[in-house]
Amino acid sequence: MKRAIAAALVLGAAFSASPAFAQVKQTRDEILFYTADWTGERFPDGRPMVADSLLKRAVNVPIEDVWEYVRERGYRNQFESGWQALHPEKPFAGRALTAQYMPTRADMEKAIKAEGKAEGRTGGTNMWPIAELQTGDVYVADGFGKIVEGTLVGSNLGNAVAARSQTGFVFDGGIRDQEENRQIPNFNGFYRGYDPSAWADMHLTAINAPIRIGRAVVVPGDLVLCKPEGVLFVPALLAEEAIGAAEMTQLTDAFNFELNRSGRNKAEFEGGWTAAKYDAFVKWIEANPDKLKMPRAEFDRLLAERRKKE
């Protein structure tokens, strides 16, 4: 018993002597923990760095095709709809930088602000995630659906998000200064609603932690695809294959539509992919190289995999 008590005292002393860990911004090791299967480049903060070229390709594929690829691999909680947007007609994509907000609780807010002061942070806690943004990021925030006094950006912070990310935001919450935000060049955002009130009675609780946006789960570094239909959060480790598969579906659909219009598909309006049809498809691609957005080597690989399945 004495030995057990002594061991407990030593263990307790060790823990009490350990430095306190940051509670708001996730550490690099914490992000690595949640994204361990990613083998590509990373930002200094640990987030997976999905390639810029892939972000550009993502906006040109139907969201259903990417969703289907992700869902078939067990990621069933990655899509959320029901948004308002600054520019609904303009899709955009980027890498998730996440933030979580909660209703104000005095003791939590005091601790969070003290931590921010020690780290040299300035301004309200709603400014802290913006300072972390990199070019190509999408600022994704869980504002627990609050719109009235839940306005996470107005025109000043909107301009700050645009300047740092050159992309936009996705807020499960509100915004203000909607008209002025719409005038910011090369900037878009999805949000739950507009209200003229300033944000109040809420505070930041996490930066770059896994968060929930409606029925979707978001991990820092996810590829965020925003289109009129809704928002899809694609795990970084699946992003390249998901976009490539969606592009291949686009190509085979376009070829099939052309066959249907010309009557060459006969009764095979969908499917019917024989060896002869695949050969005709390749010739069609060669005659229409502008339709190929992926590298030719990637196309050849995906086509070979598809032919094996038939």
Q: What is each of the regions a protein language model found here?
A:
Residues 1-4:
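Positively charged n-region of N-terminal signal peptides that target proteins for export
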Residues 6-16:
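Bacterial N-terminal signal peptides
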Residues 18-22:
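Sec/Tat signal peptide C-region and signal peptidase I cleavage site
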Residues 23-67, 71-73:
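N-terminal pre-domain segments of enzymes
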Residues 46, 161, 222-224:
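Buried hydrophobic positions in well-ordered alpha/beta secondary-structure cores of metabolic enzymes
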Residues 61-65, 69-220, 234-310:
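Feature captures the catalytic cores and cofactor-binding loops of soluble hydro-lyases/lyases
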Residues 229-232:
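Channel- or pocket-lining gating/hinge segments that regulate access to a cavity or pore
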